[in-house]
Amino acid sequence: MTAQFRFPRFFVTTPGPCPYLAGRTERKVFTELSGPNAAELNDALGRIGFRRSQGVAYRPTCVDCQACVSVRVVANEFRPNASQRKLIRRHADLDISVCKPWTTEEQFALLRRYLKARHPGGGMAQMDELDFADMVEQTPVKTHVVEYREPATNGRPGKLVGACLTDTQSDGVSMVYSFFETEDDSRPGLGTFIILEHIRRAAEGGLPYVYLGYWVEGSARMQYKTRFQPLERLSAGGWHRFEAPPLPAEGTGAGFPAPSKLGQLI
């Protein structure tokens, strides 16, 4: 006898200030990810533009705005450009480890430095270690933390300079949240490198896509995602190739915006 399928219940948040476009309001639809079919539900929702935050899947459903567009990199067709190849060579000595979704004091310390430098007034600015543990460890799906470290010395692990909370889905990997060292001049472009390394990892694993969350038209800090081509965007007719206007040369590297409450892990 097969288990009875239960259709998920969806809810809508109350409108609030948009963290990406001044003067706009945001609203989200969300559902709980729980039970034996949580991973399958997350996969299905991910293909129609939902993102995961702990045990919840959500997507924007704003009344008067459709600027948030789901985007994903076609991993097996991606070819790094000259500046991206330079970053790959520069950071080729980093030790990369795929870790279980358990938090460490070292990860939290790096997160605090990252938020102080990049998002001092954001919703995560007051996050404590318990909040961080909830963000990483409360997951009903296959997830892990990818760590990026300086080379080991005398048999001891090197300094942690980057990390990314990453979900593995049936058709790709979803980068939930990344953070990295921002004040080390010898390690420029770490955020970009982390994305490049995830694209390589997906392609080598036979996974077609790397989900980058939302590209937000009109938000300057979200434009870096268009540097990773070929890129697809989700519209009412499905996924289509997407090329945004050219961007300035890459600087210190990309990073995912800091979340505050439900729905800002995009």
UniProtKB/Swiss-Prot annotation:
Family: Belongs to the R-transferase family. Bpt subfamily.
Function comment: Functions in the N-end rule pathway of protein degradation where it conjugates Leu from its aminoacyl-tRNA to the N-termini of proteins containing an N-terminal aspartate or glutamate.
Superkingdom of this protein's organism: Bacteria
Source organism of the structure: Rhizorhabdus wittichii (strain DSM 6014 / CCUG 31198 / JCM 15750 / NBRC 105917 / EY 4224 / RW1) (Sphingomonas wittichii)
EC number, as in UniProt: 2.3.2.29
Any one of the GO CC terms: cytoplasm
Subcellular localization(s) per the UniProt record: Cytoplasm
Lineage start: Bacteria, Pseudomonadati, Pseudomonadota, Alphaproteobacteria, Sphingomonadales
Gene symbol of the encoding locus: bpt
Chief localisation class: cytoplasm
Protein's name in the database: Aspartate/glutamate leucyltransferase
